[in-house]
């Protein structure tokens, strides 16, 4: 076709002309934009350009399958396209969930939990037995804190008629099943302050303030004087988008703020090669502030989920904390009460506890888990294994 006639045709169909120019520009931008290895906002690895390694039917099929994934992951403006999709779904179609996340009022996001799955029930019973066994082996020393999800505190902010299962009733069941431990019911303590900033809107964790109110209840049960927040400077970090956001990617999400207390206490992360044989690894401060420059800002607390670490405190005696990541923002408060706070995370600690406890003669043992982790962590059973 004559170029002049082509231009004339495009003038007759301006929408077609706009789309043609748009896709041509997008094609050029895709060519010149460097590939990304990782999406911070989605918290996922992105597909890289595949290589054709075998000229065969299967080889070509695999190549084109992977190339389709590559184009999808590396398209120019991927983050913005996802946000635009979210805008359309929530405004035009009134969508109230995305990626397994419920989109609630006040910009809150909640993990969807309609019922207890059989696999969760098995893990739940196994973990209850482990905590009970630990309490029986160390009578009078073990406390258990099972932290409710944000949906328990803010049911009014859930989408209309969202059928969340009865998590608070399950916590009651846990208390009845654990007569050998001191059960710390933190739900009521948190509910008394529910108008405050207790849980992140875009993440599954509680905030540093939520952790403090639970810590106060622990101190009351142990007869301890709580950490004096007014005596320490507060640090803040803005623009935190958590794990709920990375799954839902809602267009109008409000970022969270992380706070922490600037404490001089030291943290030692141990290398473990056998039960009772820790070798000193990294010595550092309580916070990895370098994490504030990346997506997973919450990992700044205690440098993430280390298998075994020790915090040097300003009090007396020793405590062992067996935990999930909820405890990472809780543990710094214990520096006011204990001289040594040992922290075990079974996701990265492959041994039992008896040798560790025998070597350190702890004054107290605290098991601290969120409800969601307690129903899904397949490693906590090690706490119930003698040896």
Regions from the language model: what does each represent?
Residues 1-387:
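Extracellular glycan-modifying ectodomains
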